[in-house]
Amino acid sequence: MRIEQVIADRYCAAVLIDFTAPEGTILDQDYYAFDRSVSATSRDGVKMQTYGIGWEVLPSSTEDETGRHATILMTIHSLKGEFNFIGAKVKLTLDGLYRDNCLEELVVPGRWSCTFTLPETDPGRLCTVNEPIEIEGKNAVLTTLYVSPLSLTCEIKQGTDDLKETVEPIYSDDGKESIAPEVTLQNGETVGAADWLFLITNYADERGRYCFRMDEILDPETVSSVSAFGETFSVE
């Protein structure tokens, strides 16, 4: 196993893994996952408390006649607190390659560990909005938008309606319809969301953070506006 590349933005990190199975093992599925342990400490000394993981098998950039090779993208995000991945130190331990996220079908046994420091420069743009929005008739406030090559993140806080009731539609449709994030580039092109990375609501703090992977890798400097929750907001 080899770590090919590690990139991060404020809210998540992406680890590109090049994996070659032992002779006799064919990696021909469209999904694999590792059992794992992740610890991270921000450059301010804050430890990541809880985290979520995503896995995606990517098309290989090289020919592999043996069928033993897989390129796997691992994404890591914090589930609690204000953890910032920029410049964070990460220790990653992977235990066995599995065919499923429940870790029931072991494909390749083994243990692999590494420690790395994420890039110090924030590749994204954080834009303060503080504008009212509606989610199926319920009021909230869109506080910030964050655009990076990795993701588009919307943060909201409670408005005049109870936050728990307000965000119910987000979880019923995975944010696809109730948030419907889309960016417009300076050349007029629009880019939609491929999938959500995480949907987190902190009811104690009356805030929510909803992060999406877009259909294309974005250059934040070329984004002119973001559409979300049925409204369009300039980020220039």
Q: Which ranges hold each PLM region?
A:
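Alpha-helical, hydrophobic structural elements that either
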Residues: M1-E236
